[in-house]
Amino acid sequence: MDITKDETKIRQLTEQWRKIWSPEDKPFTGEGFENIFAVGENEILVFDNFDNSVVVLHSLQEYLDTWIPVMQNFSYWSIQLEDNLDISIDGDLAVTTFSWVGGGKTKDGQEVKAKQYGTQTWKRLNDKWRLVHEHLTVG
């Protein structure tokens, strides 16, 4: 087990996650999440604080079915991780913590700014790191 190699891979996957969440002026499709999240029913558990409520999701399909319609309201969206990505690895499990800032513009022209704090749990499945738990809270 090579902690440096594992940490590098998780950093790369976290950046891929951020890029998918930053479609800028293109439609948000979620394409690429299948290479980041564990797939299959009840493979993931997501708690996202959104619109004054908590969204709980259990599969990548639920994730896409929830966020694609929300993101269709935006003509532009982009996020950046703040300089605080922390990665802890123990065997086949890893935890990342971070915060992101960003925002965009709705299709009716309203500017939106956002910040969230995140915790993600990664598990090595079939020799590949996969996201199995995500918790995002509005900051």
Which residues does each predicted region cover?
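Short S/T/G/P-rich N-terminal loop/turn motif that feeds into the first structured element of a domain
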Residues: 3-4, 107, 124-126
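A solvent-exposed, acidic/Ser-Thr-rich amphipathic alpha-helical stretch
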Residues: 4, 11, 30-90
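Short, cysteine-centered beta-strand-loop-beta hairpins and adjacent loop/turn segments enriched
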Residues: 72-73, 103-113
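Short beta-strand edge/turn micro-motifs at domain boundaries
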Residues: 95, 115-139
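Residue-level preference for beta-strand/loop junctions
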Residues: 79, 92, 96-98, 113-116
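Hydrophobic/aromatic beta-strand elements that line small-molecule binding cavities or substrate pockets
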Residues: 63, 81-87, 100-102, 117-123, ...
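Short, aromatic-enriched amphipathic alpha-helices that serve as compact interaction elements
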Residues: 6-32
